[in-house]
Amino acid sequence: VTAAIFITLAAHAAAPNTNAASNAQANGPSLITSAAGVRLRESPDAGSAEVGRLQLGLVVEELERSAAKARVGSTEAFWHRVSAPGGARGWVFGGLVAPFDPARRDEIYVRLASERVAHAAATFPELTELVRFLERATKEVRRRDALAELELTRLVALGRSLASFSIEEQEKPPYKPWVTEHEPEIVYSEPAGQWYVRADLYWNFEKKYRGLPVAERAAWQGAQTPLPGECEGYLPCHLYVQKISNGQYLKLYPRGAHSDAALANISELLGHVTEDMRGANPVFDVPRADRAEFRKTVAEMRAQLALVPARKKARVLGQLDAISRRFR
């Protein structure tokens, strides 16, 4: 992560713009930065000199506030002169900070994490800074549900950070150090040329927080996380992958928010298999030596669907029956 991401300590306090009226705040309220790499400026003007940068989720003390709002881009807000940990002082635009109340720390952290991870166009620096914030935040919250939300968001943000750079960039900074730092939590897929968060971390999370709404989301995340390697035409491998992903989700959450999508994923694969079986040169195969184990996997998949409503699972069960007959 580049040094610019983290707070740069100013060598001296940035003086307020003497031409801009401001409201002095003695023992002013606390604010929290709501974006990555927030610029700390010498005066309340977007064109003034930059004296430092503040990382996402940093709590600062407000010293002054501009008398009038200003417009930066499409946002209209006050400017705030702040004091940051380490002694840096300067002006930040109000669109990049939010009120912070220590008594509402859990709620504020969860909301900030949710807002930032929802930013679909987030860059690698923004995602790594989000991960850093969440690593700090999980040590500060008290409620179990808040901790769970932050832990899951951290895994999701980590996964997105790994997907934000190409195979050609993997050995270059800042990507290589990031991968090395998180190697215990990630796995590399040679065929895809990409790093993924280990799927078992999501399943372990689901078990740890089962009973909380966040556990269902973790199970779905685990089901959709790619696994390293590839199955090619080896059908037992394809079914095993479905069993430990979408099938496992349906076993745990047969009526869950993503149950229809999980069934559709399984059915899509099985549909390709049944269509392939009707061709002259089928790609999918089950060697005779592996058919006993294959039938066991099919039976386990059927069992995973036991509590799924009958009308919803009928298509998948029919596809499994057809495949079972083909590879007796």
Walk through the language-model features, giving the residues of each.
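TPR/TPR-like alpha-solenoid repeats
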Residues: 99, 133, 137-140, 144, ...
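Flexible, glycine-rich surface segments
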Residues: 216-272
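Boundary regions of SH3-family modules and the immediately adjacent low-complexity/disordered segments
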Residues: 23-24, 73-136, 174-184, 188-197, ...
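Beta-loop motif signature
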Residues: 23-28, 32-76, 113-120, 132, ...
